[in-house]
Structure formats: structure tokens, C-alpha cells
Amino acid sequence: ASACRVDMVLTLCMAGAMMLLESWQERGRKFGLPWMAILLMSLGTLTKGPVAIVLPCAVAWVCALLRREGWLRETILMALSAVVSLILPALWYYAAYQQQGDSFLQLFMEENVYRFLGKMSYQSHENGLWYYFVMLPAGLLPWTLMVLPVICKRWNMQAVRERFRNMDRTEVFSLVAALCVFVFYCIPRSKRGVY
């Protein structure tokens, strides 16, 4: 239990929301909004911040765009889902602000906005853009050694493009989710190995 972190709860909420959004899209967006995904995004936001809304909505939006499912409709649905997901956290944040005042607001801004923008009032695990490109393979050793022959092999770009075109829905979702999360966490200057 000493190794448990709030990041694990955030990951549970985000992964669950991503899968529920994907399932909702696959079923033709029936039954209005994806209420369980919205609840998980709200809980994730209470756990660690708005990233729990941003990433699942971004993954669902990119997947829909790649499938040519209508960018305007998807933009509206994801924006609406994000706004509804903010209701529960907004109530909590309002109560916290009423109790703590500007110190709560400053902490929220410091941990969510300034950390992402690299404008924190203190140095917090600052690493360059390259950090996760090194840490991910290092963290997956010795299995990354098995990937070296694939990386060193001369690639047939036509075959690679064809492979991407023939991906099924689940493969597209998995690839988009992994890439969106990886790229998102590479952006902030504050990076840690636990992310």
C-alpha cells in the first residue's frame, strides 16, 4: 500500500473514460452523452486535475477524426462532455475556495496550469523534451532490447502506410491513446519517471 499513488487513481479514471468514450462512439453515440465516461472524468479531475478530462476527450476526438466521423459533431460532443465533466469538480473547487480562499486558487494554478506551462514558483523535476524518449525504453528494459532489430531494419514505407490503413478500430484507438498520452506528458517542463 505504500507504493500506491494518486496517479494510479488518475490512470484508472482516464483509461476507463477513454474506453467508455470509444465504446460509446462504436455504438453510434446512442443514449445522449457518455455519462459513465463523464463521471470518471469528473472523479479523475478531483483526483489530479483537468488532465483527466483533456486526455480522454482528446483521444476520442482524434479517433473520430481519423475515422472521418464528422469533426464538427465530434468537436461539439467532446466539448459538451468536457463541460458537463467539470460540474462536479467545480462544486468541489468552489467549496475549497470558500474555505481556503486565494491559497487554494494559487495551489490549483501552480499544480495544474503553471506546471504545464513551466512557470512554477519553484523548480520541480524539470527535464527536457527528450526525457520520456529516454526513460520509457530504459524503464522497459530488458524488453526494449527485443525492439532494436525492428528499429535498425530498413523499413518499407509503403508497407507501413498500408498497415496503418488496415488497422481495425481497436488498434487505432490503442495507438492514438498511447501517442496522445505520450505527447501530452512530453510537453510540460516538469517531468517525473512516475508519470
How does the language model describe each region?
Residues L40-L43, T47, A52-V194:
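Transmembrane-lumen/periplasm boundary regions of multi-pass, lipid-linked membrane glycan transferases
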Residues M8-G16, C57:
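Membrane-embedded alpha-helical segments of multi-pass membrane proteins
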Residues S2-V9, G193:
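Short acidic/glycine- and proline-prone juxtamembrane loop motifs at membrane-interface regions
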Residues L10, G32-L33, V51, Q106:
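Residue-level recognition of membrane-helix boundary sites in multi-pass small-molecule transporters
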Residues P34-L39:
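The feature captures the transmembrane alpha-helix scaffold of multi-pass secondary transporters
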Residues A1-A3, G44-T45:
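Helix-capping/transition residues at the boundaries of transmembrane alpha-helices
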Residues C13-L20, V150:
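Alpha-helical transmembrane segments of multi-pass inner-membrane proteins
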Residues A17-L33:
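Membrane-interface transmembrane helices that cradle and orient dolichyl/undecaprenyl
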